[in-house]
């Protein structure tokens, strides 16, 4: 039974040697080889006089173990090389990542500095605008106060002018009424004198006609 297992392991090692590059496959093969050695001891076929036999099972097991050892050494070398490559790659990736982080932190600090500078400039501009607005409001309040005082003084002056104008208008109205009364009296007296003059003229004309009539009548009698 152990002989069949060893033969099968030898064929497997010869046919699938490339698959033993995988540590798991190689470990599985080693377990099978240990199991074959165990069977060999149990069957009592591991005597010392058979170790040197060319076709002895112990010799064949030792040969497989030597090959496995060589594979392990080769695999360890490859693993070390791969480990160095992976380590180098990881170091490069870590260095690149650290550089990227440093560059990003630098950009963020620069952006923060720019933002702080922009905020400071913005605050300065806002304070300047607030100062200008406050000064403008104070100036506007002063102008409004002056205009209010001027308007009040103008109202007082206008009231005085209105009062004086009203007094003058009252005086003028009284004078106009007096003048109107005089004009009316003058018109009445003028109309009377007109009729008187007209009457006198008529009387003179009538007297003249009467005189002419008398003179004519006197001539006719003579």
Curated annotation (Swiss-Prot):
Residues 1-193 are cytoplasmic. The chain crosses the membrane at residues 194-214. It is a single-pass type IV membrane protein. Component of a SNARE complex consisting of ufe1, use1, sec20 and sec22 or ykt6. PANTHER family: USE1-LIKE PROTEIN, VESICLE TRANSPORT PROTEIN USE1. SNARE required for targeting and fusion of Golgi-derived retrograde transport vesicles with the ER. This is Protein transport protein use1. It comes from Schizosaccharomyces pombe (strain 972 / ATCC 24843).
